[in-house]
């Protein structure tokens, strides 16, 4: 099983995942997930199962906002458990110019270099 080091875990979350979310690159985003990954948003509450469920969630995000940005990351990563977490800011803008700003926390569980489970806690 492939194990990532601390920096690789952080890069997986911030560069391979979030940078592609911000570009709305669906294929690149989904490439970070195992086929049977589970994406949970306890603050909604909602659970998206498998790549198809995760794809549907991102189709809604990408279709609902003209601009998507995630940044100001504060990350922790544990090589032994293959986990990474981040506190970060989110900026979203709709087609009519409405702006949404959030401060979120994500927790990722990584197996063999890809996400197996993700938990997202949103501020609003």
Predicted regions and their residues:
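Short, low-complexity N-terminal intrinsically disordered segments enriched in polar/charged residues
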Residues: 1-32
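A solvent-exposed, acidic/Ser-Thr-rich amphipathic alpha-helical stretch
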Residues: 26-79
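Short beta-strand segments enriched in hydrophobic/aromatic residues
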Residues: 33, 88-92, 106, 121-122
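Structural motif
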Residues: 36-38, 83, 107, 114
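Short, surface-exposed coil-to-beta transition loops
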Residues: 69-70, 85-87, 100-106
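A short hydrophobic beta-strand element
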Residues: 79-90
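Short, cysteine-centered beta-strand-loop-beta hairpins and adjacent loop/turn segments enriched
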Residues: 91-101
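Short beta-strand edge/turn micro-motifs at domain boundaries
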Residues: 101-124
